[in-house]
Amino acid sequence: MEFLLQLENILKKRKQDLPDKSYTADLFRGGVDRILKKVGEEAGEVIIAAKNSDKKELTHEAADLLFHLQVLLVEQELSLQDVVEELRKRHS
């Protein structure tokens, strides 16, 4: 879980700096529509991997989905902590 918080900080820096030759910066430059397209693609790949009962592929695709979801959260100025707090509300 700690790494997800580190990744969030990396993503915020990429959004701020928009370095050349950065996949993440390219996503931010493409705006919310490009990011949403990637989230949708990765969600579909997670579904297929799960349907195929392929744990290795599911792990890979879930990582891709989590990454792109974090990019979306940063783009929308939300944090993982915001999501965790919502989950806590639902389960308390």
From Swiss-Prot:
GO cellular component: cytoplasm
Record key words, sorted: Amino-acid biosynthesis, ATP-binding, Cytoplasm, Histidine biosynthesis, Hydrolase, Nucleotide-binding
Record GO biological process: L-histidine biosynthetic process
Extent of the signal sequence: none
Keyword ATP-binding: yes
InterPro entries: HisE (IPR008179), PRib-ATP_PPHydrolase-like (IPR021130)
EC number: 3.6.1.31
Compartments it resides in: Cytoplasm
Single GO molecular function: phosphoribosyl-ATP diphosphatase activity
Pathway(s) the chain acts in: Amino-acid biosynthesis; L-histidine biosynthesis; L-histidine from 5-phospho-alpha-D-ribose 1-diphosphate: step 2/9
Keyword Amino-acid biosynthesis recorded: yes
Catalytic reaction equation(s): 1-(5-phospho-beta-D-ribosyl)-ATP + H2O = 1-(5-phospho-beta-D-ribosyl)-5'-AMP + diphosphate + H(+)
PANTHER family assigned: HISTIDINE BIOSYNTHESIS BIFUNCTIONAL PROTEIN, HISTIDINE BIOSYNTHESIS BIFUNCTIONAL PROTEIN HISIE
Stated family: Belongs to the PRA-PH family.
Name recorded for this polypeptide: Phosphoribosyl-ATP pyrophosphatase
Provenance organism: Leptospira borgpetersenii serovar Hardjo-bovis (strain JB197)
Lineage, uppermost ranks: Bacteria, Pseudomonadati, Spirochaetota, Spirochaetia, Leptospirales
Name of encoding gene: hisE
